Amino acid sequence: MDKLLIRGGRALHGEVTVSGAKNAALPELCAALLSSEPVTLRNVPRLQDVATMLKLIRNMGVSAEHDDSGTVRINAGSLSNPEAPYELVKTMRASVLALGPLLARFGQARVSLPGGCAIGSRPVDQHIKGLQAMGAEIVVENGYMNACLPGHLKRLQGARITTDMVTVTGTENFLMAAVLAEGETVLENAAMEPEIGDLAEMLIKMGARIEGHGTGRIVIQGVERLGGCEHQVVADRIEAGTFLCAVAATGGNALLRNGRADHLGAVIDKLKDAGAEVSAEDGGIRVRAAGKLKAQSFRTTEYPGFPTDMQAQFMALNLVAEGCSMVTETIFENRFMHVDEMLRLGAQITTDGRVATITGSQSLSGAAVMATDLRASASLVIAGLVAKGETLVDRIYHLDRGYDRMEDKLRGLGADIERVSQ
């Protein structure tokens, strides 16, 4: 099993290129199922979750090739098996995103209940209720969502859908289902993440009629068919945020090429409050540590608030900043699993329910630690970069789910880091 060996204490300097966003690429791969014409996606990151999604759609009979330049060419004209089996999706939450497109185009789908995440419950009931409002009949049995249209319907029907909570994958599923539905669909309480806006832009290129993406109310006028398109996946704001925290925590200075400062407002504001200099530059984001950092308290919320996917990484920065801070996690109920591993490095953190209290300005010492989920693994890498001595991060398959060649990019910034097999 691969591990990362980090010898800490080096400031990060130079330039790094931010990859395409995993959380945009996955729904956009599913969106290609909506058309029988060729779709080309560029800037697709080489990640384990992407490889799993490609394997899934190939299993449906779809032609899909991912080349070394990050381009994926898909032709779903040959799709013959509208099923997402458990064996292929048990490691990945995003499998549920196949449900809407398959229902919209074929009127039927059989999708395994998703797996792939240890950080908390993410029930699919909102997906089911929304698609039922559009006329679908869905039965959950034996670990599968079995969906179809009743005999009197040839297409999904437009509807007004208001979810009980903001749901990113739910918004994406409804968006993809609605573009081929009959009539108008209105999504209230819609998620506003940039990745949803990017998905909508791709669908519009395919011929969809969508307004309001990027707001809490999206209106879709259904069309009878969609064509192919070429689309570039938006840059990964979470990867960019991770590198911003790593550079600032190590006292470095770096340019993040392709980084979108307009997608990271809440994180950048906290970094500036901590004393880092962060600015948008032509082609990216510049971050420079300017003296000792000051610990910052924050609360995770839906976009455009502070992202839950950046909670662990910013906590790692707070470990070496001056002062005490409180981190409140409002999105997931089990997202402090990295805390126990940080304690092994000498961190001083206490937790009470969804609140973690961190005493900063600590001297961390390298140790063997274990990744428990995707973003926790990134936070342990950051902690290892600032710790004295060697840190060995185990179970980095979690990291590979969402970061494209992270150790290579960090090494390019001057980190002493290598992948080892033990």
From Swiss-Prot:
It comes from the Bacteria. Keywords: Cell cycle, Cell division, Cell shape, Cell wall biogenesis/degradation, Cytoplasm, Peptidoglycan synthesis, Pyruvate, Transferase. It is found in: Cytoplasm. Its EC number is 2.5.1.7. UDP-N-acetyl-alpha-D-glucosamine binds at R93, R122, P123, V124, D125, Q126, D309, I331. Coiled coil: none annotated. The active site is at C117. Pathway: Cell wall biogenesis; peptidoglycan biosynthesis. The modification 2-(S-cysteinyl)pyruvic acid O-phosphothioketal is found at C117. NCBIfam families: murA, PRK09369.1. HAMAP family: MurA. Cell wall formation. Adds enolpyruvyl to UDP-N-acetylglucosamine. This is UDP-N-acetylglucosamine 1-carboxyvinyltransferase. It comes from Delftia acidovorans (strain DSM 14801 / SPH-1).
